[in-house]
Amino acid sequence: MSFRGGFRGGRGGSRGGFGGRGGARGGRPIQQGPPDTVLEMGEFMHPCEGDVVCRSINTKVPYFNAPIYLENKTQVGKVDEILGPLNEVYFTIKCGEGVQATSFKEGDKFYIAPDKLLPIERFIPKPKVAGPPKPKNKKKRSGAPAGRGGARGGFGGRGGSRGGFGGRGGSRGGFGGRGGSRGGFGGRGGSRGGFGGRGGSRGGFGGRGGSRGGFGGRGGRS
């Protein structure tokens, strides 16, 4: 199996390593002529389809299209692809005009300009820093229960409301507690034409203190 079948990750890099093309493109403007100094970049492994396959011997990662030189600063070609995981980087060199990939032997070294390298930390994902927990928004309740002296058409406490549910001091046309209501169901202090508690009602069913023409409790009259 050729190297390209073994190490090629496809175009567009993968997480935690290097795929094919794509990745650390960009950088500084193209430099004309050889650099003042060069650093060891990789060792020759074998040729592959006209390119040179190298194993990186530098702790940093080269730019794509970065010029590659021999020790005497003669340009061999440019970085074409970067391959392999972060702890074992490989790269290929696309040879320049007049340079043959088969002219090199295993162990030959290639060099690069210092300004064409990126630190390996640029390719390592940074851990997420846990921040303080976000405060939870308390939902506001719409409306509020009424206290004493309820509103009309709502739920009241003492001193009931008209047309609603009342506590003490009943409501007209509703269900009342003490202090009955007219035409409704009353507690103590009955209502006219309804069902009363103590203090009966006229024409209804009364509790204590009977009612006229109704059914009385204690002290009732027929």
UniProtKB/Swiss-Prot annotation:
UniProtKB keywords: Nucleus, Repeat, Ribonucleoprotein, Ribosome biogenesis, RNA-binding, rRNA processing
GO biological process, one term: snoRNA guided rRNA pseudouridine synthesis
Any one annotated GO CC term: box H/ACA snoRNP complex
Subcellular location field: Nucleus, Nucleolus
Region annotation Disordered: where it falls in the sequence: 1-35, 124-222
Domain of life: Eukaryota
Residue ranges, annotated region (RGG-box 1): 4-27
Primary location group: nucleus
Stretches with biased composition (Gly residues): 1-26, 146-222
Molecular function, one GO term: box H/ACA snoRNA binding
Positions of the UniProt region annotated as RGG-box 2: 148-222
InterPro entries: Gar1/Naf1_Cbf5-bd_sf, H/ACA_rnp_Gar1/Naf1, Transl_B-barrel_sf
Subunit structure: Component of the small nucleolar ribonucleoprotein particles containing H/ACA-type snoRNAs (H/ACA snoRNPs).
Described function: Non-catalytic component of the H/ACA small nucleolar ribonucleoprotein (H/ACA snoRNP), which catalyzes pseudouridylation of rRNA and is required for ribosome biogenesis. This involves the isomerization of uridine such that the ribose is subsequently attached to C5, instead of the normal N1. Pseudouridine ('psi') residues may serve to stabilize the conformation of rRNAs. The H/ACA snoRNP complex also mediates pseudouridylation of other types of RNAs. The H/ACA snoRNP complex mediates pseudouridylation at position 93 in U2 snRNA.
Family membership: Belongs to the GAR1 family.
Identification of the protein by name: H/ACA ribonucleoprotein complex subunit GAR1
Gene: GAR1
